[in-house]
Amino acid sequence: MVLTRISESRNRQHGKDNVIQEFGTVYPVPIGLGENVRSTSIGALNQTLADTMMLRDLYKKHHWQVSGATFYQLHLLFDKHYAEQVELMDALAERVTALGGVPLAAPHDVAEASAIPRPPKGRESVPAQISRLLDAHEQVLIECRKAAKEASQNGDDGTNDLFVSDVIRTNEMHVFFLCEHLADGDPHGHQKGA
């Protein structure tokens, strides 16, 4: 009796030869938008997707590592925001695909593409966690507003709507909740009245 390894006994289908569309290419889709417009939108969507994935991971990290008097409230809030960021990721990735592009998906690609700095591996204080989240949201919001304006100018109303109605509004609401949690103090160290 000859024993074969599982990897030898199955017809493996993955590998470079089986890639049907390279990242960075734009497949033709008949939606009334030219390739250049779709390519520009895909780039902005993938950047927002990478930053949203990093923000999602920050929320889960802080959900697991939060401590202190507000543990319970923040533990739940961070998990709620995490879930809402996951919904945004799905919408962003599907829009990339609908425009004929390839969405970022692998963690190493996301870490490389994201403009949001990687956090330390260790546990941070609550003010540091919230400050880090606020900075990440601000990064997403600044870039999203630019991308929404460009999509609008290019006639890509679907991408503009996704940025404005979903990504910007969700991130602004998250910022509101985080800031209200720190109503007695400023997470960025600014003095009141300054």
Predicted regions span which residues?
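Acidic, low-complexity proline/glycine-rich segments
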Residues: 2-31
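Long, contiguous binding/interaction regions
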Residues: 2-5, 9, 71, 103, ...
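Disorder-to-helix initiation segments
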Residues: 26-48, 126
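Helix-loop segments that flank and shape redox-cofactor active sites
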Residues: 32-40, 55-80, 143-159
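A structural signal for well-ordered alpha-helices, especially hydrophobic packing surfaces
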Residues: 56, 63, 82, 89, ...
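Conserved alpha-helical segments that form or flank metal/cofactor-binding pockets of metalloenzymes
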Residues: 60, 66-109, 178
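Acidic/histidine-rich alpha-helical segments that form the ligand environment
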Residues: 62, 94, 108-166
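Short, contiguous alpha-helical
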Residues: 87, 161-193
